[in-house]
Amino acid sequence: DYMKYDAVCVGNHDIETGHNVYDRVRRQMKTPWLAANAVREDNGKSYFQDYVIIKRKGLKIAVIGAENANIAAWLTPELWSGMRFVPIVSMMQAKVDEVRAKHSPDIVIVATHTATGKGDGSVLEAEGLDLFKSLKGVDFLLCAHDHRPFVTVNEEHTFGFINSGSHCRNIGHGHLAIEVKDGKVVSKTVSTDLIPVK
């Protein structure tokens, strides 16, 4: 809340603190905790919030979050009891489509706590490039977890990937140039870079 973030993406270090801590802190914070793939065992709904809709300068921005899907392999079950973690690649396109249909956002950001990976679908904790290759209707994909600074954009410059690394060494920066005609977004061009923190 102090940093005035619009939302935060749940990461493995949040879950490591256990239910007593993260459930209490989440209730105390105004900032939404996002993790659409952390699913409750009792009712199949998300344990955390799936997404947030933000309005800025006449634009509607959707931020959809996801936790690392490999949590159960690292942490003892009592830390995450009552939920399971769905692979992000298997669920995110449907969530993007749902949010687009329900809210008609001008901008869609997918914020994840998954590593960059190689894009070959082989590592559950590293779904970043797998998502980048497969997602449609997304403007920016934010990744983390592996502490590996990496940015890229697709050939059309309509989809950007940002992993700022770790330890506040970089600020991941995404720039989106938007053309609006008759009140509607008609074109978007993205760029990404890392700004070193000195």
Model-predicted regions and their roles:
Residues 1-197:
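Acidic, metal/ion-coordinating pockets
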